[in-house]
Amino acid sequence: MTEESTKENLGAPKSPTPVTMEKNPKREVVVTTGPLVSEVQLMAATGGAELSCYRCIIPFAVVVFITGIVVTAVAYSFNSHGSIISIFGLVLLSSGLFLLASSALCWKVRQRNKKVKRRESQTALVVNQRCLFA
């Protein structure tokens, strides 16, 4: 395996590295380059946490939803219908519901994808087993 194919497999950046130019006190321009980060490198650095977005959103959504309930309850207890605080409470309430719904949707999609992958894997195993015993 060549070095270039290894870099492609590891997700090395395919475009040129970004360049930043700085001036130092002697009126010279210093050029520094910084590497680009690919998705594969990001997954390696975070341990694959970027694929668990729905798990991160749930606690935040619950806090926003409860805050929305409290703010809306306080606003309507003072009979301030249509005031800024009641609108803010309703926005928080709807944002919390939206985040919870999107988290549930992401979870469902992920479960469906896992089921499809599992089914494909079982199919490949059965075909391979038939080839071995045929």
Curated annotation (Swiss-Prot):
It is found in: Cell membrane; Membrane; Perikaryon; Cytoplasm, Perinuclear region. Coiled coil: none annotated. Keywords: Cell membrane, Cytoplasm, Developmental protein, Differentiation, Endoplasmic reticulum, Membrane, Phosphoprotein, Transmembrane, Transmembrane helix. InterPro entries: TMEM100. The modification Phosphoserine is found at residues 15, 121. It is a multi-pass membrane protein. One of its GO terms (cellular component) is endoplasmic reticulum. Pfam families: TMEM100. Expressed in dorsal root ganglia. Expressed in neurons as well as nerve fiber bundles connecting ganglia and fibers innervating muscle layer of the gastric body, jejunum, and proximal colon. Expressed in arterial endothelial cells and neurons of the central nervous system and peripheral nervous system (at protein level). Expressed strongly in lung, weakly in brain, heart and muscle. Expressed in enteric neurons and vascular tissue in the muscularis propria of the gastrointestinal tract. Interacts (via C-terminus) with TRPA1 and TRPV1. Interacts with TASOR. This is Transmembrane protein 100. It comes from Mus musculus. The gene is Tmem100.
